[in-house]
Amino acid sequence: MIEVKRGLDLPIAGSPEQRIDDASPVRHVAILGTDYVGMKPTMEVREGDKVKLGQLLFTDKKVPGVRFTAPGAGEVVAINRGEKRRLLSVVIKLDDNEEAVSFTAHGEQALDGLDRQAVVDQLVDSGLWTALRTRPFSRTPAPDAVPADIFVTAIDTHPLSADPSVVIEEDKAAFEHGLKVLKRLTPGKVFVCHQQGAEIPGSQLEGVQHEAFAGRHPAGLVGTHIHFLSPVSLGRKVWHLDYQDVIAFGKLFVEGRLDTRRVIAVGGPRAKHPRLLRTRLGASSSELLDGEIEAPDDTRVISGSVFGGEIAEGSRRFLGRFHRQFTLLEEGNKRAFLGWLSPGLRRHSVMGIYVSQFLGLNQYAPNTSTNGSERAMVPVGAYERVMPLDIMPTQLLRSLIVGDIETSMQLGCLELDEEDLALCTYVCPGKYEYGPILRDNLTMIEKEA
């Protein structure tokens, strides 16, 4: 067991009840192009085309062979693009009776004997290959690449998240089948990282190693797991994926169907009934959350966590591919008179500067305000309080800000993704957004190194 002692469990109100309810049906689903780092699409459909569940929508010019398939059957009603023709989303209006592309059903007994190339081909054809991401760089792997190890994230320490063991309990067999499929992809180990005390199936499988983590966030981040168990470098890559995608892998190979069902958490101070909902990949947030939000006109809907999620609005008003929650917060569009003099009766700070820490409050209802503008980076030890990895965060962040990629690599930036620096952003007195800064540096490293 690995215990994470440095970090932060944000005491935010609206924690979801750990029971699964069926969500209201949605009429629109989407693939969000911004979920895939560096992806440049070659479109295979146009607006107005009819598609089946699992049918090809577009391929990736940057990674030949990678296919992105429809998360639902119906009509392609919008292909949204942003600056420089960047793909934002492909929106599908669902049919009442969805047709689906069928795939080969191998059955349970055949999983151990599957050929690696057959596994790769079926994952690519179904579009489930895009559930895999590399570390470093967090890109969709090439179909001919081979990882040193594969990490399954079966723990979630984000604020207001779902308990993975509750979700896996309903699909134990499919989860084990998915682990067997993953083992065909790597000569190394398949690490299943979970909460201490959680009963996660598959520990008896050959080549599968269960690892327990305990402590504060980011104990549930794959970057933390990789750092302690199988560090990466430019010449050594690992892959990772979410536990619900493992279940989908198992169902694809045993039943021959693409399972797009997902369980997500809905929580936050503005959630009427914080709980777990069973919905589907790419679900429309406006349709899914209809009737779930208090004061919807003054609420920000975040696909993902408060630390690393994306605002679900406009062409991105859908569940992100790698998100497992919606967080509902009050918009921070009001200014407090002399707010900097406030004693902070109901405000949270890791630096202990508010009276609230002496009042014993264990839940807060924050809004989206940053409580100040950008300013100089001030090294006051805040980053060290929330960084459990064996790196020097202040020095690393400084090198990232100035774009010193050589120093950043020496200080460990290749192990990180945007979510790994989210806590540094939260505690930063200078209001820096370190996630985008890290991504810019990783892009430069990938081009030059």
UniProtKB/Swiss-Prot annotation:
EC number from the UniProt entry: 7.2.1.1
Keywords: Ion transport, NAD, Sodium, Sodium transport, Translocase, Transport, Ubiquinone
Keyword Transmembrane helix part of the UniProt annotation: no
Domain of life of the native organism: Bacteria
GO biological process terms held by the UniProt record: sodium ion transport
Reaction(s) this enzyme catalyzes, per UniProt: a ubiquinone + n Na(+)(in) + NADH + H(+) = a ubiquinol + n Na(+)(out) + NAD(+)
Keyword rRNA processing in record: no
Subunit structure: Composed of six subunits; NqrA, NqrB, NqrC, NqrD, NqrE and NqrF.
Name the UniProt record assigns to this protein: Na(+)-translocating NADH-quinone reductase subunit A
Organism: Chromohalobacter salexigens (strain ATCC BAA-138 / DSM 3043 / CIP 106854 / NCIMB 13768 / 1H11)
Upper lineage: Bacteria, Pseudomonadati, Pseudomonadota, Gammaproteobacteria, Oceanospirillales
Gene giving rise to this polypeptide: nqrA
